[in-house]
């Protein structure tokens, strides 16, 4: 255990203890203070005799902040107007001093640019190797002609089994069947595009929810004999659900297999998984055949058999999936897993193993564990609709070019009843790496621990209870503690088997800000 600043009253580590005394910063109760103008998250800050009112922008004046957000092909900038924060699109802004203003007056070319950007985000992942584009081009050629051949084969099969002698009837049957498959594939495409990053960050939750969807699709297919006039509609709905479930299974399969491969034998683990799937599926097929043979002399019982067995078999199916997911110990880092690791580190100075984190993380069907806590932590850009305290807006004004991230607070409405809840936001800069993500989250966990400790000591702790001096000291000392912990924390995480090279973030968490040096 170490402490670089023995005189610090913010963070103190016990030498020998299994349950630590949380680092607490007790906010002074006197009101006569000198406020700071520079509210940076870095260690070197300057205090000046400026009051909070001197730095608040008048309501009739909008001050540009040096923070630019690029999202979905649009460029936006934060502005402070009065005591509120606004995020305005600056694509049309005629300002040659910054390279972010595109200056395209032609609406047609702007539409082309936005369309191409949307198509790129829809089809391509954000971080891939250089040869990925060439691979996708050849994959396009392969899949287009393969799909066309399947259509021709389907039409030929309908003719072979005697569905009508006329061309129109065979074509109609083939068209209806292809329509069913086409809707399923289209839904699968839309689903995977909308949840691309969720397959990494919420793998267990997405996989179990799609398994429930697959089970429901079986129930829909069982209803087709009851409503034969709606066969195409029911079959299409069931196929859509199956395609969505299949897309999730394929997208998450490699990550699941990688978690079990301890000797870089991913190919062997995947091959054995396919063998297991084929053998287990054949056993299920044999069970269904035996049950049908048992009731083959009673047509009424045989017709009712699927409806009787469906809830029983579905329960066992989902139970097996749920219990199996609990035994998957993912070594990749996400924001939620990092929170669990860093909280354990702050309290016990130990990094938990992937198995321990997996047990605490669970499946997460009711949402992430961190979002239900006091002062939940969020990574992303600031929401202008949320209430941002004045001291946080002043921190954004004084942001410097050396900062790889900044930390602010917000008051947002959550849940069905839209109850306001205080939270902490981490805004990462463009080019931030995994070290920046881990350091910023560790610093924020230190801040939350201090705020939570003060909340228990007082009946209520709000934004107004924090002065600029409080927040500056809190961010300064927490960042110092996070930086001091970096080497020891990273070493223990690697020893426990965590992959620290990258931190997997959701689409909203991947949004970065760009620091505009011309605004200084």
From Swiss-Prot:
One Pfam match: UVB_sens_prot
Gene Ontology CC, one term: chloroplast
Membrane topology of the entry: Multi-pass membrane protein
Predominant location category: membrane
GO biological process entries: anther development
Keyword Membrane included in the entry's annotation: yes
Transmembrane segments: 275-295, 301-321
InterPro entries found in the cross-reference section: RUS_fam, UVB_sens_C, UVB_sens_RUS_dom
Subcellular location: Membrane
Keyword line: Membrane, Transmembrane, Transmembrane helix
Record's keyword annotation contains Transmembrane: yes
Annotated PANTHER family: PROTEIN ROOT UVB SENSITIVE 4, RUS1 FAMILY PROTEIN C16ORF58
Record-stated family: Belongs to the RUS1 family.
Record protein name field: Protein root UVB sensitive 4
Recorded name of the encoding gene: RUS4
